[in-house]
């Protein structure tokens, strides 16, 4: 069910780590998406996932520079986000394999009233009220 992402300029988007990683690795379609966004937000969890993927100190430095160049806003994990994520894990871990990181990212998106941009729609399909656009690397 993946499709190219289409959004109206001005949409509040929060990006999943997959889109950031593709842009960082030079995928033009992902980079163009970031360039066309009015603002780029990510969950603190997405930030940590991105940093964990660094292969060495030089790449860690390059990731930080990449985030700075795109003026990425990192959204903190608040008590409200924690509570909502706990409910998602409790409700969907067994039935839909809801993972901790995905629950926190979904809760961050909902709490901040932002649309989640991801290529991993199946990770989030069970989350009610989550606005999501799917992205496919071309």
Residue ranges and their predicted role:
Residues 1-42, 52-65, 138:
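Short, well-structured N-terminal submotif of metal-dependent ribonuclease cores
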Residues 2-7, 11, 73-119:
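Active-site neighborhoods of divalent-metal-dependent phosphate/nucleic-acid chemistry enzymes
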Residues 19-20, 46, 81, 104-105, ...:
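Alpha-helix capping/helix-boundary segments
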Residues 20-21, 48-51, 125, 133:
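Nucleotide phosphate-binding site architecture
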Residues 31-35, 122-129:
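Short loop/helix-cap segments at secondary-structure boundaries that form the rim of catalytic
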Residues 43, 47, 60-63, 82, ...:
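A general structural signal for well-ordered alpha-helical segments in protein cores
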Residues 78, 131-138:
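Short beta-strand->loop
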């Amino acid at each position: 069910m993946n499709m190219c992402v289409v959004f109206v300029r001005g949409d509040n988007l929060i990006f999943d780590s997959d889109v950031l990683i593709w842009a960082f690795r030079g995928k033009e379609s992902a980079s163009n998406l970031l360039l066309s966004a009015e603002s780029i937000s990510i969950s603190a969890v997405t930030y940590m996932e991105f940093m964990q993927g660094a292969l060495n100190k030089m790449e860690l430095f390059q990731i930080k520079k990449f985030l700075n160049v795109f003026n990425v806003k990192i959204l903190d994990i608040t008590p409200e986000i924690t509570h909502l994520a706990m409910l998602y894990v409790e409700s969907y871990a067994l039935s839909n394999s809801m993972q901790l990181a995905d629950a926190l990212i979904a809760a961050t998106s909902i709490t901040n009233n932002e649309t989640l941009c991801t290529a991993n729609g199946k990770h989030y399909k069970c989350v009610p009220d989550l606005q999501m656009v799917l992205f496919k690397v071309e």
